Amino acid sequence: MHSRTRAAFPLFAILLSALALRAWGLTWGLPTATHYFSYHPDESVVLGAAMGMNAFTGHLLPGFYHYGSLQLYLVNFANSLAFVFGGVNTVIKDLAQDHAQWARLYLIGRSLTVAMGVGTVWVTYALGRRLWGHGAGLWAAGVLAVTPLHAQQSHWLTVDVPAAFWGALALLWTAKTDDALRGDAPGRLAWRYALGAGVFAGLASATKYNMALSILPLLMIGVLERQTKILLVGLASALAAFLLACPGAALDTRTFAADVRYEWVHVSREPGPTFADTGNGFVYAVTHTLSAGLGLPLLLLALLSLGYAAVRRARGDGLLAAFALPYFCVISLASVRYARYAVPLLPLTALWCGRLLADWTAPRPHSLFVLRVSAAAAVLALTLADCVVLVRPMAQTDPRDRALAWLGQAPTPTTVGFAAQPWFGTPPLSPYFALPKPGGWRRFAPPGQPTHLDANGRQWSLTVPGADWDTAVLTHNSPHYVVLSEYDYRDALRLHDARALAFLSALRRGYAPAAVFTGPPPLFRRHGSIDGLPTQDLPHDMLYPNPAILIYEQRK
């Protein structure tokens, strides 16, 4: 018993570390008296769709299928359960008065993501142990626990980390199926494990549609082993689980088809300014997404581990590759290339790294064991440091809030202008700026020149362009201050947008820099600049907690 406890201690420590990294800063960007919506632009969409359902009134379909429905149901259930026990009020009538209750709904959904993120670390250990032994499982769990992208994305009420959780479970049950088929009694257990693998693959695709690819390893095993029953059980259970977790696919077919088609067209053909001219998708995924998401030391280790897998070509390598290769191709061929799309690959990356580290650090005569372990520990320590630096801004005052506080000290009356339509990346001079749809805040602004009365009784006059980078904001309205967000200018300047360049030229003639708000970049990344404005070398959706905010003041 004592030996079992001692053997379990490293895993417990890894899971505790994973929890700490994912819960640290969990309240970042939640609604407050100054902004009624999360600073993460997708969270309000997910929460709104989830809380739009009501089991007590028979409204059981979300009517929203841009994401799969499973996570919406889980968030709705968690918040409804909290309501039953008096932890939260799910009926929000006035955001100005009920913003604290609204924030709790977000927080409950985020806590669910944290649990699934930590759960993925455990599943990664279990899968690594089954494929390559206890040591490989521990190393793999340790790698995923400190992977920067996974830790960051596990903070948010979104679908990527939950989808990766279900996908990892599908792989674990597929590995069990494979072991059972090659064991002493393949007929007894294999089909049961195949049933579980299919169910988890169906739940993964009911969370995020492209996770339907997680059924491929099971199908590969069924074909290679010539097990028709495995194929049929896996496909049938996956389809049944998908329809149970996303019933709108069968009961609200027209809306479901329209939303899925919209996402297909958007992701495959409409890169927008954010991803325009970003080069080859396969190269971008490595040099931009994984470079930032893993950190340089872990990226190098991951590339080495892939080479090692290509040499070893063990059965487990084929199992992982059956999902990893098609999925990597899908996200690399897409026109929209958010870093979060790579999250389902992170457990597999950790597994390959874990196997390499386990073999690398295995005791051997005359093998420089201490040096090998020290090198492996150094990679994890550097990755942990990178993870901490990436997550830390969520535990600090957000640059948007710091900019708002700075403007709050300005003399009154104050007119503030913007280069582009204010949204989630803008200091909340209106508490409605971060509404899910850009420009939605105007519905809550008085007619004529928009104004906002803040919590301290200060009235802001807001000068907002009819079109982004309209120099009339400066030449006709002459606001006292002009606010720029990194989300406004980063891609516009990268693409040499003539309107943006003209606006900045006019801005510099009439205005002087007054304040800059940002935080430190992650390790192995750097602060850069475009046309003299600060930028951070991070993917678009990894920058949410820490965009640079610039304030210019009218020259005297």
Can you annotate each of these PLM segments?
Residues 21-24, 46-53, 67-74, 84, ...:
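Transmembrane-lumen/periplasm boundary regions of multi-pass, lipid-linked membrane glycan transferases
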Residues 12, 199, 235-240, 310, ...:
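Signature aromatic-anchored transmembrane alpha helix within multi-pass, membrane-resident enzymes
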Residues 9, 13-14, 18, 87-97, ...:
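Transmembrane-helix signature of polytopic, membrane-embedded enzymes
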Residues 23, 71-72, 248-250, 257, ...:
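Catalytic lumenal/periplasmic loop and adjoining terminal transmembrane helix
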Residues 129, 170-194, 204, 222-224, ...:
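Membrane-interface transmembrane helices that cradle and orient dolichyl/undecaprenyl
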Residues 4-6, 130, 184-190, 225-233, ...:
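Membrane-interface helix-loop-helix junctions at transmembrane boundaries of multi-pass membrane enzymes
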Residues 99-103, 107-131, 169, 173, ...:
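Transmembrane-helix motifs of polytopic, lipid-linked glycan transferases
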Residues 153-154, 160-163, 204, 209, ...:
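Hydrophobic/aromatic-rich transmembrane helices and adjacent perimembrane loops
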